[in-house]
Amino acid sequence: GEADGVKPEMGVVCSQGVVGIVYMTSQHYSIIMPILNVNSKISCRLRHSEHFGSLIWERGQDNIAYVTNIPRHAEVTLKDTVETNGYSDIFPSGIPIGKVQRISDSPDGISYLIRITLFTDFATLRNVSVITNYQSEERQQLEQQAQQEKQ
């Protein structure tokens, strides 16, 4: 919880990879939105080609998720690793998420829908760590300043 420096929007990981994002905190407790939540959307990339997309979960199996918005011109290979891309303050780049299991066309016809097997075993998950980004506030202030000057 907050007594230990945990705040909403902090990344949560385990030894296997990404678990989720801190959603709410109190003095001594935290609630996490796991990647196994239909409202979760994590920015990610393919390790081999470095094309980026979004990780989503669509109910069902606790070891399967999907990567969307990968362009059809991207080189995607089975068993390629999906990892965080570092585009936000929540997760640094390179934290493993899962392996490509199946590649198919998405309904929009311009991107892939990639089924992945998650590295994190949620059925046996016990210990997690929270990622602290000490430069997060500085980055947010700079982005706000840039937005204000743009207007």
Regions found by a protein language model. Name each.
Residues G1-Q151:
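A secondary-structure micro-motif
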